[in-house]
Amino acid sequence: MTLNNLGTGTSTGVPSIACDCETCLSTDPRDKRLRVSVLIEHGGKTILVDTSSDFRQQALRANIRYLDAVMITHCHVDHVFGLDDIRPLNFRYGAMPIFANAIAWIDLRRIFKYIFEPTHVGGGLPQLIPHTVVHNSPFCIGDIEITPLEVIHGKLP
């Protein structure tokens, strides 16, 4: 199994706009990080975890030519705002399986209303095949077994 961290930056990316901290001013290439997304390759399957706001740039940089599926961990902007950029893959290969939990699907339908309730197609819409996952209930993509875990993220209690 190969994991390719396409982005490991914060929600604003690194460097952050207008930030004068040591990291953001650094010339070290390790301090230039895109927002979070991971590419998993195993057994001939390619899975993307989260479509970050930087997904287009990440896909071009990593030469992503095909995806078997996308998994959405949660619907913070930095994890889903690249969803529209799967369209070129849809144009070539058709609809794509997207895996997310029920709460994420509610948010995705609200955030991307134009995909789920289209009024104007324009340059095309992302073509999704929705799959709802349940925490602690394994599912498979090809021969890859995945067990979604609930993680507290963002503001802690």
Residue ranges: model-predicted function:
Residues 1-157:
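Binuclear metal-dependent hydrolase catalytic cores
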